[in-house]
Regions:
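Short, Lys/Arg-enriched N-terminal segments with co-localized hydrophobic residues
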Residues: 1-17
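Core catalytic alpha/beta fold that binds nucleotide/phospho-ligands
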Residues: 14-253
Length: 253
């Protein structure tokens, strides 16, 4: 039999072996991109783009995402030289050259979020999606990717907006863990009342959804008992933030 003391040690070891960091910020906030050593910044991010507002917004979001990833690597005590080792898979998904550390990026409007996951014992696979609220025909969109049973559940929800973004974000997050696009949204099975997700395009794990941030947020991580650390960029540094309410889904379990 395992003693209480040894059980606590095992739990602590489990948590230490797998750590998840999430940072978010807004491009309207100041951030010192030029502090990142030049050799850690790809050439396309060093350029100052001039064009329409949509192009400049997207470019600034990419720069902010790179900055946040740099900050998270330092927070996690990992070598920032990993930024030099980012490559794209056949599906176009950016990732590190080491299997046990993974990251994923999402942006919506002026908001950017980055997830960094470290798993000392096995391959890491993560995906996130953020969506800044905007007026949409939620029912019509649901009909494009959700099965009838999920649409019926959606029709009963008092908060239509929250219910829609929950259904959308969680799908994007699990698909992004493998670099699969939204063309496969309808392939993800979502059981909202059971808090279960099934997909052929991601591994086993857990997914967190919350509406407590300035945007709707979903993160998939290929592990159980996820305990992500959230950080908000305040214009000078990363500030830890406690998330008080969230939903935790079992994925492919």
């Amino acid at each position: 039999r395992i003693s209480f003391y040894n059980a606590i040690k095992l739990i602590c070891l489990f948590i230490i072996c797998m750590t998840t960091f999430i940072a978010y910020a807004n491009i309207q906030q100041p951030f010192s991109f030029d502090e990142i050593p030049t050799d850690l910044v790809p050439e396309y991010l060093r350029m100052e783009l001039h064009g329409n507002s949509r192009i400049t917004q997207r470019h600034q979001c990419r720069r902010l995402a790179h900055f946040l990833l740099w900050q998270l690597l330092k927070t996690a005590g990992k070598s920032t030289a990993l930024l030099e080792q980012i490559y794209r898979t056949q599906s176009g998904r950016p990732q590190f050259s080491v299997d046990n550390i993974d990251f994923n990026i999402s942006h919506s409007g002026d908001w950017v979020a980055v997830l960094l996951h470290i798993n000392k014992s096995e391959k890491s696979a993560v995906g996130i999606d953020i969506e800044f609220s905007k007026k949409r025909s939620f029912s019509a969109l649901m009909a494009h990717f959700a099965p009838q049973a999920e649409q019926e559940w959606f029709a009963k929800q008092l908060d239509e907006e929250q219910a829609f973004y929950r259904c959308w974000c969680l799908r994007e997050a699990v698909l992004k863990s493998q670099g699969v696009g939204i063309v496969k949204l309808s392939s993800v099975m979502h059981l909202p009342e059971q808090l279960q997700i099934f997909s052929d395009y991601c591994s086993k794990g857990e997914l967190l959804f919350t509406d407590e941030l300035p945007f709707y947020f979903a993160a998939f991580i290929n592990q159980s008992k996820i305990q992500p650390h959230f950080y908000q960029w305040n214009g000078k540094e990363l500030e830890e933030k406690n998330i008080k309410k969230s939903l935790i889904y079992q994925v492919n379990e």
